[in-house]
């Protein structure tokens, strides 16, 4: 098919909110804070300890407010145009999709397969998609669930695309609907009932497998590799579940199961280690120029999500403006009034849009599209020629694998075509090589986790990796399609929320004292000053409670000591004079 005529209309637009009133209010508050600090400082010698504590706390609050105002100053209104992209081209670049799961108990396989099904059914040529599922728990139930889901996918995906179903996660599509829409055709109603029955059977099989693992999963057949293994002590397991051998656009995408090798004496580096294995395995199997990573509980809510991301990648005037595309994390079935703040609505609405107008949003660990060459450590405008990419350098930096070296060279070389970069061969023909790059000892002596890939050194590997990318000069894009691109489930109980927020606070604070901290990135890298301030705003989250608690107990302390920490007005002074 001949390429379509190029259109002069932009694939995306970024407008800025006219938030002049809110800016004025924020600056006025900042003026009041500075006035209070000046008064505190000038009168400090006339007061005691409580005055000094108030000065310290209020100085902290002023500093945080400066970071807040800076981050919210330029709020963006991004807009993408997938129809224009479809008019412009019919030959799209390939995308490798990464879905990560680690515990079949905390992350039930039924949730994982719904995420996978929603991603396999997106509006994008199937011969340009490959979905890799990383199972860090090496669970036979997870693998069995994916095998059964792949059978259901042969019915579900054609059904979604034929009838243009907008919600393509089965558990959400069928929830609350006991019968098909009455205003639909007779044919649709019959197919709807059949698909729902098939999905019920799929759910029952997975639930039975979860409670009766050995009986349901035939350990003597394709599941033999899972026998007598432990989640933290097993060899690499790679299974090609679905394969689009014919390379047809309206078929089913590749689906590959991966459980990387784990040994007790080898650090596995948690999710960052799993993501690096996915990057290498996909590099030797399909080598798509773009990669999407999604948590197993974040299903694709918008079937055109990849087209929205491609509007940025293919529409950017300069690659530096789009190192990665981040979709905000929204959630379904949250508690009314959101008492724990798990929905993060205010953060996305103001802070997310604000940093979108600086150097771009942070990498949030899910719902993010990456350029493969950026993950491989390439800096903006860095040009690598065939003569400048020595085989010895590739093996020392990326690992000793001929096939991986070839795919990396194809990705990094200047002028490489992103369409031709994709490996159209069958993934099953690279199983042995994939086992090699998925082994736990492959990274030793290389730059994985240090200068390329997902970085090690923090439990919030996503923020650290995104910070390192932006410190090299790359910008990121904030994409807000309607409906939301991805929806996930947030904790609904207090203890679970505290555990999650403790992990976030600890990990973000770790990054602040990392060798790749935002301050280092600004002083010695290409991280913009206001972007550094935005990173500081979130990374200092763990310290805020100290000053807030201290300030909160000052009134009680003053009552006990018969003192005061708030400035007295004229009325208070007049009242005191009258009393005396």
Describe the predicted segments one by one.
Residues 501:
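Acidic, metal-coordinating helix/loop segments flanking the phosphotransfer/catalytic sites
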Residues 480-496:
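Active-site donor/metal-binding and catalytic loop motifs
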Residues 1-475, 487-488, 505-520, 524-526, ...:
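Glycosyltransferases that elongate glycans
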């Amino acid at each position: 098919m001949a390429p379509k005529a190029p259109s002069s209309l932009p694939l995306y637009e970024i407008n800025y909110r006219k938030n002049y009133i809110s800016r004025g209010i924020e600056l006025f508050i900042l003026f009041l804070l500075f006035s209070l600090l000046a008064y505190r400082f000038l009168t400090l010698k006339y007061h005691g300890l409580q005055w000094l504590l108030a000065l310290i706390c209020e100085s902290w609050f002023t500093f945080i407010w400066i970071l807040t105002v800076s981050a919210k100053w330029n709020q963006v209104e991004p807009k993408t145009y997938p129809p224009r992209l479809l008019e412009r081209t019919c030959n799209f670049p390939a995308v490798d999709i990464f879905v990560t799961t680690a515990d079949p108990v905390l992350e039930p396989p039924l949730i994982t397969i719904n995420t996978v099904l929603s991603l396999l059914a997106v509006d994008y040529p199937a011969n340009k998609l490959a979905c890799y599922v990383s199972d860090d728990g090496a669970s036979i139930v997870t693998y069995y669930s994916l095998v059964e889901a792949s059978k259901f996918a042969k019915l579900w995906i054609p059904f979604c695309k034929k009838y243009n179903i907008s919600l393509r996660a089965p558990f959400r599509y069928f929830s609350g609907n006991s019968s098909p829409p009455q205003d639909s055709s007779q044919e649709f109603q019959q197919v709807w009932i059949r698909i729902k029955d098939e999905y019920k059977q799929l759910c029952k099989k997975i639930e039975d497998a979860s409670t009766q693992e050995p009986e349901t999963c035939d350990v003597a057949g394709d599941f033999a590799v899972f026998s007598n293994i432990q989640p933290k002590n097993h060899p690499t397991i790679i299974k090609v579940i679905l394969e689009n051998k014919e390379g047809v656009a309206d078929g089913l995408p590749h689906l590959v199961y991966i459980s990387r090798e784990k040994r007790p004496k080898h650090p596995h580096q948690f999710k960052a280690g799993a993501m690096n294995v996915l990057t290498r395995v996909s590099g030797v199997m399909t080598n798509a120029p773009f990669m999407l990573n999604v948590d197993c509980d974040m299903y694709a809510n918008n079937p055109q999500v990849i087209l929205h991301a491609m509007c940025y990648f293919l529409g950017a005037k300069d690659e530096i403006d789009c190192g990665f595309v981040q979709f905000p994390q929204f959630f379904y079935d949250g508690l009314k009034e959101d008492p724990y703040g798990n929905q993060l609505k205010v953060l996305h609405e103001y802070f997310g849009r604000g940093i979108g107008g600086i150097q771009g949003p942070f990498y949030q660990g899910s719902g993010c599209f990456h350029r493969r060459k950026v993950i491989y450590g390439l800096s903006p405008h860095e040009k690598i020629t065939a003569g400048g990419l020595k085989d010895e350098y590739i093996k020392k930096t990326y690992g000793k694998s001929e096939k991986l070296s070839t795919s990396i060279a194809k990705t990094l070389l200047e002028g490489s075509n992103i369409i031709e970069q994709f490996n159209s061969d069958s993934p099953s023909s690279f199983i042995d090589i994939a086992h090699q790059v998925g082994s736990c000892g492959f990274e030793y002596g290389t730059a994985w986790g240090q200068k390329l890939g997902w970085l090690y050194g923090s439990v919030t590997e996503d923020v650290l990796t995104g910070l390192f990318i932006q410190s090299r000069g790359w910008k990121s894009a904030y994409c807000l399609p309607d409906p939301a691109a991805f929806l996930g489930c947030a904790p609904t109980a207090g203890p679970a929320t505290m555990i999650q927020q403790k992990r976030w606070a600890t990990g973000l604070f770790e990054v602040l004292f990392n060798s790749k901290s935002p301050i280092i990135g600004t002083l010695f890298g290409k991280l913009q000053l206001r972007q550094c301030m935005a990173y500081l705003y979130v990374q200092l989250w763990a310290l805020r409670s100290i000053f807030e608690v201290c300030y909160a107990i000052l009134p009680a302390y003053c009552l006990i000591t018969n003192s005061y920490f708030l400035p007295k007005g004229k009325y208070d002074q007049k009242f005191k004079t009258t009393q005396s």
